[in-house]
Amino acid sequence: MRLLLTAAVLAASLAAASAAEIEAPGPQGPLRGLLAGPAGADAPVVLMIPGSGTSDRDGNQFPGIRAATLRLLAEGLAARGIASARVDKRGLNHSSEAVSDPEDVTLAAYADDAHAWIKVLRERTGAPCVWILGHSEGGLVALKTASTRPEGICGLVLAATPGRPLGALLREQFRANLPESPLRQPTLDALEAILSKLEAGQPADLSNVNPQLAGIFRPSVQPYVIDLLAHDPAKMIAATDLPVLILQGTTDLQVTMADAEALAAARPDARLVRLDGVNHMFKSAPAERTANLEAYANPDLPLADGVLEAIAGMVLDDPGTTSRRSPAQ
């Protein structure tokens, strides 16, 4: 019994030693994250950027998204000799002190945060460069980060990342997911009016809009949406020559293979991996909506086959990991 207890304590101490809370400077206070996996300059390091809204470092978002996609990625990569940093976005969760208003943000501001993390991670680990993995909207942050200052970045992993301007994607999502009802066409008409205003860089009037749309496009987030709408992911990926892995599931209800193919067309040398039967959370799921969304709430459902293999293969095989040895910025 004592031997088992000693082994348990040792295992716990080793686990604790492999994960550490870390900080990077934010605009008003610290950005916070968790560095996990093997230590030392020989281990590649992946910075994970979560998706839209209030997504946390694990990739979860209250109330319905508990798939823990980023945590599962970190654990799987650690088992393959790859370290990772999972971070909370400015103003949210453990990074709540970084800014007073998390909705007052731009892609460029998120890119500034990513650069701050890259500097911290290179100094702490001794790694010559850091990979950036962006999930969903986080992939746009990864592209913005690479386009503003590529130094110190090994390459990009774009996981379920939009490949078309956000306006086109939102229109497609609403058309695909709104059920047939008397409210369907009025909602689509209202969406078109809102997006047309925001795409023109102007605030949208929500006075006669249904509560669902009014919540999504509330005045406090409209400046950020205007900023997002002005970016074309295909042009962004074409502007960088860093190694890129594009990961896309075929049963993703939010981002589709058309997005992945648009990114790949803009960068023909990028590595595109199609994951059959895999949804937006990188879990195996059917295309049927109800069953697909059930995987969003299940942290015990493992990542789909091929996800970790694709990422680890890119990170461990690509020469960018060892060749991009520019000085820390």
Predicted regions and their residues:
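Primarily recognizes the serine-hydrolase "nucleophile elbow" in alpha/beta-hydrolase
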Residues: 120-177
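Accessory cap/linker subdomain of secreted extracellular hydrolases
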Residues: 157-227, 231-234
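Short, surface-exposed "cap/lid" segments of acyl-processing enzymes
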Residues: 41, 46-77
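Conserved alpha/beta-hydrolase
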Residues: 68-96
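Alpha/beta-hydrolase active-site loop
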Residues: 102-123
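Catalytic active-site module of serine/aspartate enzymes centered on a nucleophile-bearing elbow/loop
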Residues: 281, 287-329
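N-terminal cap/lid segment of alpha/beta-hydrolase-fold proteins
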Residues: 18-41
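Short beta-strand/loop motif that positions the catalytic acidic residue
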Residues: 240, 246-248
